[in-house]
């Protein structure tokens, strides 16, 4: 929806704390870890995060949280509940992927299995699967 998109401001250098708050509002430990890691990586040019904002509030975010070996590992695509399904998040993801590709990075999106169809509709191709292991 063009009117919705025009009401939003894209920020390619949002405050790390605001992005962390949006992604992990109820998980302070995870939020603090994310904030610390993002600040450290961005200061060395190893990560980027973009947001869409309305009236100063983040309504959507996506990031490339590891830039290495010619690949940009994208993750944390998140849109506020009220605007999901309106194409806002998908458009931001595609814009960031295209910008990274124009700079010579190969965008790679890591996602949970239930989100594969969403990213395939955006033009991503499933290349493989990763497993995550946690120490118990």
Region spans (language model):
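Acyl-donor-binding surface of acyltransferase catalytic domains
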Residues: 1-7, 111, 131-135
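Conserved active-site alpha-helix within GNAT-family acetyltransferase domains
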Residues: 90, 113-130, 136
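Conserved GNAT acetyl-CoA-binding A-motif
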Residues: 100-112
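Conserved acetyl-CoA-binding loop-helix of GNAT-fold acetyltransferases
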Residues: 75, 79, 85-102, 121
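Short acidic/polar active-site loop segments enriched in Thr and Asp
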Residues: 70, 105-106, 125
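Short amphipathic alpha-helix that is part of the acyltransferase structural core
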Residues: 1-40
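A conserved beta-strand-loop-helix scaffold within acyl/acetyltransferase catalytic domains
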Residues: 27-78
């Amino acid at each position: 929806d063009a009117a919705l998109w025009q009401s939003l401001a894209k920020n390619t250098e949002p405050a790390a704390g605001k992005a962390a708050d949006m992604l992990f509002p109820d998980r302070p430990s995870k939020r603090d870890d994310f904030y610390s890691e993002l600040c450290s990586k961005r200061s060395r040019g190893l990560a980027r995060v973009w947001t869409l904002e309305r009236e100063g509030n983040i309504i959507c975010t996506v990031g490339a949280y590891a830039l290495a070996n010619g690949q940009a590992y994208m993750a944390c695509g998140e849109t506020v509940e009220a605007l999901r399904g309106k194409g806002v998040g998908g458009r931001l993801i595609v814009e960031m992927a295209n910008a990274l590709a124009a700079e010579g990075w190969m965008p790679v999106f890591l996602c949970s299995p239930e989100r594969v169809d969403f990213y395939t509709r955006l033009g991503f191709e499933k290349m493989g699967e990763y497993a995550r292991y946690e120490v118990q």
